[in-house]
Amino acid sequence: MTAQLPTSRIDRTSPVPFYFQLKKTLAEEIVAGRWLPGDRLPSEPSICDHFEVSRTTVRQALGELEAEGAIRREKGRGTFVAEPRSTS
């Protein structure tokens, strides 16, 4: 299932970088359980259009989420919510 993008927007007057605002918004969807493990995120161009940000901004936000283990990217398939890491 492809996850639906939240209705929140980037605050263009905030001193917080756009990529960080986007990362926080996407992470909140995962933490709140609105996006479940295995759900496919919308494409990078869709995220760009929805939030009115550059592809570089989207890639930086997604790259950080991937580094944190929140999402996984599969070349040619898309970006998916990752399975939670076990703490054992």
Task: List the predicted regions and their residue ranges.
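Extreme N-terminal segment that seeds HTH/winged-HTH DNA-binding domains in transcriptional regulators
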Residues: 1-53, 63, 86
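Beta-hairpin "wing" of winged helix-turn-helix
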Residues: 34-39, 67-76, 80-83
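DNA-binding alpha-helical recognition surfaces that contact promoter or target DNA
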Residues: 60
